[in-house]
């Protein structure tokens, strides 16, 4: 009825207003591909989907799942990701649901209909993991969970042997952790010395068990966060700028002093902005303008 009245495709998902935004996102991502992507084949004996071998893979095309302003907090991210894969791998990145390739299309669902053609999917938020698994099951498309342009989120400083907390959506948090570890390993020195930082990833939102490391934390209340800061006394905290005052208050309550900004490296405890739109309603572009 709605499709006829609006003259456009309509999908429905069950939401009750009692969950966080990423639960609805997860359902929406999955339903978009279930509805509009070319179908796989069903093995009648097992009644399970098997890869549709009739869909021809187009080498040089990569799908990017999970790009939304709420998760990425950067409206320029699709452009940066497309440039990254073009320059690094000579491949075309298809950024579903966000970016110029969506807005300029005569039909924003064209890329979804051709989703089975990409050679690989990149998952940049936990809410898109279920959709990636569906596409793997339906078309045999492998996926990788990462944030390809993570280097710009991690300032150039000494992270060796530091105790670090990263608060963001899980995939970006994990990518930042991996990038910090990579930088620690690159530092010249005695190979027998462990230069690695101790890094915990936490989030106010979806935390997939399969993407978690031991000690990662799902935050529920502000008190949970403040108790964590007081107890663990982190050297460096990456979090949305809205959380900076809360972080300072927690350190004061613990009697360990205030935190400094990233450029004030002589101070022990450092707070580094890791803007997350779902936390503050602010984009990275807005925060940069305020700092300028």
Describe every region a protein language model picked out.
Residues 1-292:
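An N-terminal assembly and electron-transfer interface module characteristic of large anaerobic redox
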């Amino acid at each position: 009825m709605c499709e006829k009245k609006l003259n456009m495709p309509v999908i429905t998902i069950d939401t009750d207003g009692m969950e966080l935004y990423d639960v609805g996102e997860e359902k929406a991502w999955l339903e978009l591909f279930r509805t509009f992507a070319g179908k796989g084949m069903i093995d009648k004996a097992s009644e399970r989907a098997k890869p549709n071998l009739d869909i021809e893979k187009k080498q040089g095309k990569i799908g990017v799942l999970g790009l939304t302003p709420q998760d990425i907090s950067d409206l320029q991210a699709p452009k940066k990701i497309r440039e990254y894969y073009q320059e690094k791998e000579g491949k075309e990145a298809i950024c579903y649901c966000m970016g110029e390739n969506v807005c300029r299309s005569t039909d924003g669902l064209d890329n979804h209909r051709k989703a089975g053609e990409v050679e690989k999917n990149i998952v940049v938020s936990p809410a898109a993991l279920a959709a990636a698994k569906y596409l793997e099951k339906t078309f045999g498309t492998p996926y990788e969970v990462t944030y390809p342009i993570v280097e710009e989120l991690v300032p150039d400083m000494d992270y060796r042997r530091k105790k670090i907390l990263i608060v963001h959506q899980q995939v970006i948090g994990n990518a930042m952790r991996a990038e910090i570890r990579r930088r620690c390993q690159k530092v010249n020195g005695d190979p027998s010395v462990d230069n690695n930082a101790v890094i915990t990833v936490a989030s106010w939102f979806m935390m997939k068990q399969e993407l978690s490391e031991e000690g990662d934390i799902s935050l529920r209340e502000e008190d949970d966060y403040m108790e964590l800061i007081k107890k663990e006394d982190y050297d460096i905290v990456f979090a949305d700028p809205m959380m900076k005052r809360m972080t300072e208050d927690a350190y004061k309550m613990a009697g360990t002093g205030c935190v400094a900004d990233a450029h004030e490296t002589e101070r022990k405890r450092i707070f580094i902005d890791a803007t997350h739109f779902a936390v503050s309603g602010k984009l990275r572009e807005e925060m940069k303008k305020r700092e300028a």
